[in-house]
Amino acid sequence: MKKLIITSMIVVTIALVALACGNKGATAVSNQQSNTGASGDIHFKAPEGWTTEKASSSMRVAQYKLPKAEGDKEDASLVLYYFGANQGGTSQANIDRWISQIQQPDGSDSKSKAKTENLTVNGLKVSTVDVTGTYTAEMAPGSGSFHNDNNYRLRAAVIETPKGNYYVKLAGPAGTVARWDQSYNDYLKSFEFK
């Protein structure tokens, strides 16, 4: 009986250690986030009101739900991606790809409607895009299934760091994204590389 209890305790201990190790990349309840790499740290702060979600892939550094605005049917989603040094493409290639994920109801070119900006945040070069229309991005890479969401807004940014680019993508109903405009701007301004 003693041997069975000791064996059970060992199994439970191993399971708890494995569970704890498996959550190394999990997001803390705190709004303060950091992603540590061999060449330094990227630090950022998620604004009040955003709901931290468990990242659904290893390329997602952080994932948030931004609660819907009154009148909208669903929440917006914001994901911070990191693919590694020299991975994920150039700033312009990503800006162009994001713009192509929004179609205009009148058939006009989304590129002419998109607002782009280049800025410097805490010494980091940041390229941004903001475009509204019908969201047609693929639901998951390689799935062959695509969104077809009218009156959506996509705000995205490429943050260039010494260890590689980070990619921020916010997509959701236009009213919901507008509700969170200031907190999104604050989020981008919070990025620091230490």
Role assignments for model-derived ranges:
Residues 22-24:
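Bacterial signal peptide processing site
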Residues 46-104:
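Secretory pathway targeting signatures of secreted, lumenal, and periplasmic proteins
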Residues 95-159:
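Signature of long, low-cysteine stretches enriched in small and polar/charged residues
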Residues 17-20:
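C-terminal motif of bacterial Sec signal peptides marking the signal peptidase cleavage site
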Residues 79-88, 115-116, 170-178:
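Second-shell loop/turn segments in exported
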Residues 1-10:
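Bacterial N-terminal signal peptides that target proteins for export
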Residues 50, 162-194:
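Surface-exposed amphipathic alpha-helical segments
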Residues 29-53:
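Post-signal peptide N-terminal segment of mature Sec-exported envelope proteins
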